[in-house]
């Protein structure tokens, strides 16, 4: 059975690249482009891991992460351009399991996914 991943980012090219790379590794990938859509998808389906951007339309990644934590322990990796130490600390305090800053190396992202799952 393949691993199910939710990728959440409002930058379509980033989503497309991550999706392609993870699908090459045999993962089943769903995509969301804003915070509300991500939260709905996380409530409707069971994912093995969620890659979550911080700066999203409608609802930011911190809020999405916090709300997902109210009903799920799914691993969440923040994947964001916000690289300040305080942002990283907040992400982890809101319930993220890991925090990767953009620009990122897709091999590092895959390695962290495998380490968490």
Question: Which residues make up each language-model segment?
Answer:
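Charged docking surfaces used in two-component/phosphorelay signaling
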Residues: 13-24
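Short hydrophobic/Thr-rich beta-strand motif most characteristic of the beta2 strand and flanking loop
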Residues: 26-33, 41
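Active-site beta3 strand of CheY-like receiver
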Residues: 45-51, 56
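Acidic catalytic/metal-coordinating carboxylates
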Residues: 34-37, 60-63, 68, 87
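The feature encodes the CheY-like receiver
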Residues: 15, 57, 84, 102
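Active-site residues of response regulator receiver
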Residues: 9, 53, 80
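Conserved phosphotransfer cores of two-component systems
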Residues: 43-47, 67-74, 94
């Amino acid at each position: 059975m393949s691993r199910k991943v939710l990728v959440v980012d409002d930058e379509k090219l980033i989503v497309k690249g991550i999706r392609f790379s993870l699908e090459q590794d045999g993962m089943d990938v769903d995509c969301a482009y804003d915070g509300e859509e991500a939260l709905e998808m996380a409530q409707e389906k069971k994912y093995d891991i969620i890659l979550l951007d911080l700066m999203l339309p409608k609802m930011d990644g911190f809020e999405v992460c916090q709300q997902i934590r109210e009903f799920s322990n799914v691993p969440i990796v923040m994947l964001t351009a916000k690289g300040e130490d305080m942002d990283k600390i907040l992400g982890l305090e809101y319930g993220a399991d890991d925090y990767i800053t953009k620009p990122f190396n897709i091999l590092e992202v895959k390695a962290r996914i495998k380490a968490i799952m």
